[in-house]
């Protein structure tokens, strides 16, 4: 099908749980992509993790052939996008390959902050956005209110939004018809030199690097020599094709199409995402505007439990970085935990997902330290440095000013939960920016310290609003704050992996809470274990894990008191000696205790 006017490239924008993966399943079923037997729920969420959590993490693509009512068969290239705030860069990658997007909104819940953010991204990239109301079969569906919300909050016309229910299949054909009519066809010239954008790439143990590309101009077929613009290397194409949703090889990929290219690239970083491909005969094709590198917001140390796994761990991280360009890592060593990596993530969910993927897909046992954000420090010498690890913090006497990252958070919440949300934001040292009443929902925007957001803000927000509030945030600026480093000492030895950077006002409270928590988690030893929290040289909190004691007098029946005293003295001497040489094993839960401080 070479006619460009019959191709439609689109993606779906939706908040978590508004039914985009189910809608995708319906599309695949209606266009006959899979037989009844192969149909299973959430076909595109291929990672077990995605299925379990019910979220889409990676972008996927599917090519479907839809015979419309006007008798023309259209090629629909559908690129699935994640909906969670941590994966916004995946969304911008998917959108860069499309001409249009379906904005799917749950007719019961209404517009959520996430869809608003992604929708703006789509509009900025010049895409045609088409609203769809999903879950119309639910009793609480209220299409008129939701249409009004779409118009008020996002500002696109929703008077003729298509109503459907992906679960029952009602109105899905109407969605496809409208899609073919409203979303523009791709532009591009098949005769021009090849120019293709890499949307995603992943590593296959047999095939090497598999790249998902959107061809802008020209064509590419098996046996072509392609040039990767950023590395300048040449590769021979082994096969090209599309996913429908299974791998299907095709003769070639032409302008306007989305598909995969396998070129036997063995080097993991041989085809970076956002790069441009062209033929070796036309090396001077312009580079397409790629995606911007996203800066990680949250850093945490990851350490293998057994130090023999270090090399496997490094390899696993390399493979994951290919598929997930926002993950960054640097080697790090800790006195308590040995060698590992300091990894940068986009947010807490991203961190959990990466850790689970490492443990599942690469069978590693990992210990994670508490996450921190990047702080900007102005030293007395006048230079500015950035610190992402509390144990790397220079001495307080050398620091002129400490600045913490502030994020601008947009929260959409139903009016009845507004009070709780405001209380939570104040507790997290937030400063209110503005408040808009939009029908039954309220949009509040706050400036919050990122340090407070990364720990448990999202979970707390969900619980105070009974799951109705939705959050979208982005980094805004660095701002001076009175911050201190809180060290944890176990038996008078600092444990570097447990250090935290906190606001001075919260330091005593945090120190107390942390030592109490550690007391529960550190197993009792044969001697007393002192757990202390200190700021510099000043101890702000202390608890003691009491010793286990063997009753050495059990074998004495009567007899002289000096015999008993001798045994007790002997035990005392043994305990004293033990305390000098004994070391305390700190369990994995203790390192994460920091996260669960109320």
Curated annotation (Swiss-Prot):
Transmembrane segments: none
Compartments where found: Cell inner membrane
Family according to the record: Belongs to the TRAFAC class translation factor GTPase superfamily. Classic translation factor GTPase family. LepA subfamily.
InterPro entries, per database record: EF-4 (IPR006297), EFG_III/V (IPR035647), EFG_V-like (IPR000640), EFTu-like_2 (IPR004161), LepA_C_sf (IPR038363), LepA_CTD (IPR013842), LepA_IV (IPR035654), P-loop_NTPase (IPR027417)
Organism phylogeny: Bacteria, Pseudomonadati, Pseudomonadota, Gammaproteobacteria, Pseudomonadales
Record's function text: Required for accurate and efficient protein synthesis under certain stress conditions. May act as a fidelity factor of the translation reaction, by catalyzing a one-codon backward translocation of tRNAs on improperly translocated ribosomes. Back-translocation proceeds from a post-translocation (POST) complex to a pre-translocation (PRE) complex, thus giving elongation factor G a second chance to translocate the tRNAs correctly. Binds to ribosomes in a GTP-dependent manner.
Residues at which GTP binds: 17-22, 134-137
Source superkingdom: Bacteria
Domain (tr-type G): residue spans on this chain: 5-187
Pfam families: EFG_C, GTP_EFTU, GTP_EFTU_D2, LepA_C
Entry's Gene Ontology BP terms: positive regulation of translation
Membrane topology, from the record: Peripheral membrane protein
Gene Ontology molecular function terms on file: GTP binding; GTPase activity; guanosine tetraphosphate binding; ribosome binding; translation elongation factor activity
Keywords assigned by UniProt, alphabetized: Cell inner membrane, Cell membrane, GTP-binding, Hydrolase, Membrane, Nucleotide-binding, Protein biosynthesis
Catalysis: reaction(s): GTP + H2O = GDP + phosphate + H(+)
GO cellular component: plasma membrane
NCBIfam families on file: lepA (TIGR01393), small_GTP (TIGR00231)
Gene that encodes it: lepA
EC number: 3.6.5.n1
Protein name, entry field: Elongation factor 4
């Amino acid at each position: 099908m070479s006619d460009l006017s019959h191709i439609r490239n689109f993606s779906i924008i939706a908040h978590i749980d508004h039914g985009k993966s189910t809608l995708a399943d319906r599309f695949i079923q209606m266009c006959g992509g899979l037989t009844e037997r192969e149909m299973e729920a959430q076909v595109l969420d291929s990672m077990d993790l995605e299925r379990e959590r019910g979220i889409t993490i990676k972008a996927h693509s599917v090519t479907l052939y839809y015979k419309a009512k006007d008798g023309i068969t259209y090629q629909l290239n559908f690129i699935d996008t994640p909906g969670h705030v941590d994966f916004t860069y995946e969304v911008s990658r998917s959108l860069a390959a499309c001409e249009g997007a379906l904005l799917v909104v749950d007719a019961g819940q209404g517009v959520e902050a996430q869809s608003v953010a992604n929708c703006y991204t789509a509009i900025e990239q010049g895409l045609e956005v088409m609203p769809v109301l999903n879950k119309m079969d639910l009793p609480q569906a209220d299409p008129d209110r939701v249409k009004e919300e779409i118009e008020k909050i996002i500002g696109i016309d929703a008077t003729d939004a298509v109503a459907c229910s992906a679960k029952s299949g009602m109105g899905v054909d109407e969605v496809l018809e409208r899609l073919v009519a409203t979303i523009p066809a791709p532009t591009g010239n098949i005769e021009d030199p090849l120019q293709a954008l890499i949307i995603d790439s992943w590593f296959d143990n047999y095939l090497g690097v598999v790249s998902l590309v959107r061809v802008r101009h020209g064509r590419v077929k098996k046996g072509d020599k392609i040039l990767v613009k950023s590395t300048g290397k040449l590769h021979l194409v082994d096969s090209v094709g599309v996913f429908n949703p299974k791998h299907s090889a095709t003769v070639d990929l032409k302008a306007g199409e989305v598909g995969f290219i396998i070129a036997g690239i063995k080097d993991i970083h041989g085809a970076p995402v956002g790069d441009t491909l062209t033929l070796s005969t036309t090396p001077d094709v312009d580079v397409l505007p790629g995606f911007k590198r996203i800066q990680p917001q949250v850093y945490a140390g990851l350490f293998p439990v057994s130090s023999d796994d270090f090399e496997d761990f490094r390899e696993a991280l390399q493979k994951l970085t290919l598929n997930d360009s926002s993950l960054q890592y640097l080697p790090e060593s800790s006195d308590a935990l040995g060698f590992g990596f300091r990894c940068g993530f986009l947010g807490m969910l991203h961190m959990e997902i990466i850790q689970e993927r490492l443990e599942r897909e690469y069978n590693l046992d990992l210990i994670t330290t508490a996450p921190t954000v990047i702080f900007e420090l102005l030293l007395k010498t006048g230079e500015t440095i950035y610190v992402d690890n509390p144990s790397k913090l220079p001495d307080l006497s050398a620091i002129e000013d400490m600045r913490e990252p502030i994020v601008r958070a947009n929260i959409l919440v139903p009016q009845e939960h507004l009070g709780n949300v405001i209380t939570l934001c104040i507790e997290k040292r937030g400063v209110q920016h503005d408040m808009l009443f939009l029908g039954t929902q309220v949009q509040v925007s706050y400036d919050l310290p990122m340090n407070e957001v990364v720990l448990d803000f999202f979970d707390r927000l969900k619980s105070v609003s009974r799951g109705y509030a939705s959050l979208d945030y982005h980094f805004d600026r660095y701002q001076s704050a009175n911050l201190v480093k809180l060290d944890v000492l176990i038996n008078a030895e600092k444990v570097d992996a447990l250090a935290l950077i906190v606001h001075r006002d919260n330091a005593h409270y945090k120190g107390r809470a942390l030592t109490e928590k550690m007391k529960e988690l550190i197993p009792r030893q044969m001697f007393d274990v002192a757990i202390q929290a200190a700021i510099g040289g000043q101890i702000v909190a202390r608890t003691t894990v009491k010793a286990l004691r063997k009753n050495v007098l059990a074998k004495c029946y009567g007899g002289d008191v000096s015999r008993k005293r001798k045994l007790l003295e002997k035990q005392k001497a043994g305990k004293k000696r033990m305390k000098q040489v004994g070391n305390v094993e700190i369990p994995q839960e203790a390192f994460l205790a920091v996260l669960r401080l109320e």
